[in-house]
Amino acid sequence: MKKKAIVCALALALAMLTACGESSSASESKKDETPKADRETIYQVSLLQGLTLGDYNGSVSVKELKEKGDTGIGTFEGVNGELIMVDGTVYRAKSDGSIETAPDDETIPFANVTFFDTDEKEDISGVSSIADLKKLLDEKVEKLGKNQFYMVRVDGTFKKMHARSELKQEKPYKPLAEALKTDQREFSWDNIEGTVVALYCPQYMKDLNAAGWHLHFVSKDKKYGGHVLELDVDKAELKIDCTQGFNMQLPDTEMFPTLDLTKDQSDDIKKVETKN
């Protein structure tokens, strides 16, 4: 009887260990199935060319976007303001240049974000125009490699910041260049502290985005911001994140499947990216 009891006890213990092992394996398997965020990837929502053709319908929520990065730029459904993501928070620069935090359930038709890791940094000063800043950044790109993606932060004081946002559009949507002719609003601030977030796309991306630099700004006090048209850097810290990966989420909007994306939109993109 004693031997039987010992055997039964051992069998019960073995069964419990086996069950625990299976439970642990299942837990580990579930953990392995959960994808880790790739910090070396630029995540893009839709094509810029889809936005410029007038597909302002959101396809990804703010909450979902924050799972893909902590730094980036974009816009909101109906181009309802300029999107600036800094340190994991998504801000909207409204049509009057003021800033608000975007709610998690708001949807996004176009954006680029990444998890920012500083690969290079330096202090800069006396960069008196956006052209001079782009020239400085282009020199960095030439050294590091022009066929990669770059997300940049410029944190500091600006003698001048000139930016734009736009009025929310209503359906039926017009192409972006046409909408901005009447609904773009511009603002200027002097001696303002804040952060410029800039994205660089290689030349081969010209059919999916705008090749070169695209800059947005949010003030340090999170009161003002927009799409940067001109600037004058007093003193700032420049930080560069070099990124090799690219992941684009095509939208599931009603409009996107029938858009003529073969059309050359380079002129329209230049119009919407620069000061008219």
Regions found by a protein language model. Give the residues of each.
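Positively charged n-region of N-terminal signal peptides that target proteins for export
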Residues: 1-5
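C-terminal motif of bacterial Sec signal peptides marking the signal peptidase cleavage site
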Residues: 16-19
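Bacterial signal peptide processing site
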Residues: 21-23
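N-terminal low-complexity or amphipathic/hydrophobic leaders
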Residues: 46-111
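Intrinsically disordered, low-complexity terminal/linker regions enriched in Pro/Ser/Gly
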Residues: 55-59, 81-84, 243-276
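A glycine-rich, hydrophobic loop/mini-helix early in the fold
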Residues: 93-140, 144
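Long, positively charged binding patches that form subdomain-scale interaction surfaces
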Residues: 135-199, 206-208
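A hydrophobic, small-residue-rich beta->alpha segment in the mid-to-C-terminal subdomain
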Residues: 219-261
